[in-house]
């Protein structure tokens, strides 16, 4: 069972992840307006989206190493403050204060640097949660990952209708700064999650984290990382291109686009929560955690792939909503499983660096995907982009399934 302070710290991590995705995804919500105002092609828009990941990817690896070395409380606060201020700055792009397209690029780079702390810090705290509760605890990460775009899409669409896209960035950034107050006050739960009290009388000495070189030598690490790479490719395709596809290719209004996009995120939250609950329940009843997680992964990805393949040709509101919901529900358990698998195989002492590097390499799809998709859309339209995305997530899952037969802790050699 989780103590009250640790549970509160994990809830705050989930809120930070939601804010993380609200702020980074705001550029996609505003994409139809930003593209028109700055005259961006699909390829150049893809570069703007991709620029975030140029700093986010190395920041994840650095934060994973730092999370095993210094206070998660301080590291998280510094990162959140950095990305919140960058988000506010996005609201001044093109006004003479923050420049135009160059300002967009620079602020996205700063935002990526700050946002890199969230997942390694969250995994560091959650790795100490008992296995039978770890799935639902990870909903704070994967649920925030879906809740953020949902809130960002709905609230962002409303703010843009009332005031404009610049005001949307300012409101989102200010809301993120407010989060720092409860986080800084949650010291006890954060320290418990870090294992600061494991060396109290009667407790065994805390384990030293595995060396980074030992993590990188593990074939299982690379299989999980490939799975992460393919899974995030699918997510970033949805986050970055579903709104544009609905407006530019299907002719929906901004309001209709926000409602349809929100269907994906609502279904993602439902699928992720139900999947985590089912796995945790099976484990508490004596089920094999490795077997249940593998089954859930294959079933979820299959539903997501089918949805991606059928979406480009679907006609009518009801079939469109149904397919978007199926794709989101299928994708829902995937992010949760990515983190649970990494935390389980790394162990509590090494979860920060394992998940940090795993997430760092996995998010290379954020650099490659938006630009590649932009080139495909400019050259051949949206349908091939959906097909390529489905193929990538399906292939990554297949390779993982063949390479990792059991999801269990790695036996690290003594340092």
What are these regions (language model features)?
Residues 81-98, 302-315:
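C-terminal ends and interior cores of transmembrane alpha-helices
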Residues 105-146:
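Cytoplasmic helix-loop-helix junction between adjacent transmembrane helices
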Residues 141-191:
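Helix-loop-helix hairpin linking two adjacent transmembrane segments in secondary transporters
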Residues 290-338:
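C-terminal transmembrane helical hairpin of 12-TM major facilitator-type secondary transporters
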Residues 1-2, 191-224:
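Juxtamembrane intracellular "pre-TM" segments in multi-pass secondary transporters
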Residues 50-65, 262-275:
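Central cavity-lining transmembrane alpha-helices of secondary-active solute carriers
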Residues 27-28, 219-275, 335, 339:
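Extracytoplasmic gate region of multi-pass secondary transporters
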């Amino acid at each position: 069972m989780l103590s009250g302070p640790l549970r509160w710290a994990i809830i705050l991590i989930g809120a930070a992840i939601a804010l993380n995705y609200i702020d980074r995804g705001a550029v996609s919500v505003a994409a139809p307006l930003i593209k028109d105002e700055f005259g961006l092609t699909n390829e150049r828009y893809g570069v703007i989206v991709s620029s975030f990941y140029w700093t986010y990817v190395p920041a994840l690896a650095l934060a994973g190493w730092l999370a095993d070395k210094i206070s998660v409380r301080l590291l998280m606060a510094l990162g959140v403050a950095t990305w919140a201020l960058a988000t506010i700055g996005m609201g001044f792009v093109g006004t003479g204060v923050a420049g135009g397209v160059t300002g967009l690029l620079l602020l996205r780079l700063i935002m990526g640097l700050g946002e890199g702390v969230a997942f390694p810090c969250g995994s560091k705290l959650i790795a100490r949660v008992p296995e039978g509760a770890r799935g639902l605890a990870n909903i704070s990460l994967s649920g925030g990952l879906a809740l953020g775009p949902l809130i960002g899409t709905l609230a962002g669409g409303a703010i843009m209708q009332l005031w404009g896209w610049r005001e949307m960035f300012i409101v989102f950034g200010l809301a993120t700064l407010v989060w720092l107050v409860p986080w800084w006050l949650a010291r006890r739960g954060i320290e418990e999650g870090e294992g600061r009290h494991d060396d109290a009388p009667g407790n065994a000495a805390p384990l030293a984290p595995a060396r980074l070189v030992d993590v990188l030598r593990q074939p299982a690490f690379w299989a999980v990382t490939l799975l992460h790479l393919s899974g995030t490719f699918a997510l970033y395709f949805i986050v970055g291109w579903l709104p544009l596809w609905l407006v530019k290719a299907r002719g929906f209004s901004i309001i209709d686009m926000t409602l349809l996009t929100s269907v994906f995120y609502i279904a993602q939250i439902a699928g992720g929560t139900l999947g985590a609950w089912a796995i945790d329940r099976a484990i508490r009843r004596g089920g094999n955690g490795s077997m249940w997680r593998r089954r859930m992964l294959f079933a979820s990805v299959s539903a997501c792939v089918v949805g991606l393949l059928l979406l480009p040709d679907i006609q009518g509101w009801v079939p469109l909503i149904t397919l978007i919901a199926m794709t989101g529900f299928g994708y829902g358990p995937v992010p949760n499983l990515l983190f649970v698998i990494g935390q389980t195989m790394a162990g509590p002492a090494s979860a920060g660096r394992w998940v940090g590097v795993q997430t760092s390499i996995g998010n290379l799809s954020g650099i490659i995907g938006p630009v590649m998709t932009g080139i495909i859309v400019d050259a051949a339209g949206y349908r091939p982009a959906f097909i390529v995305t489905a193929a990538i997530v399906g292939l990554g899952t297949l390779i993982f399934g063949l390479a990792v037969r059991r999801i269990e802790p790695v036996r690290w050699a003594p340092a």
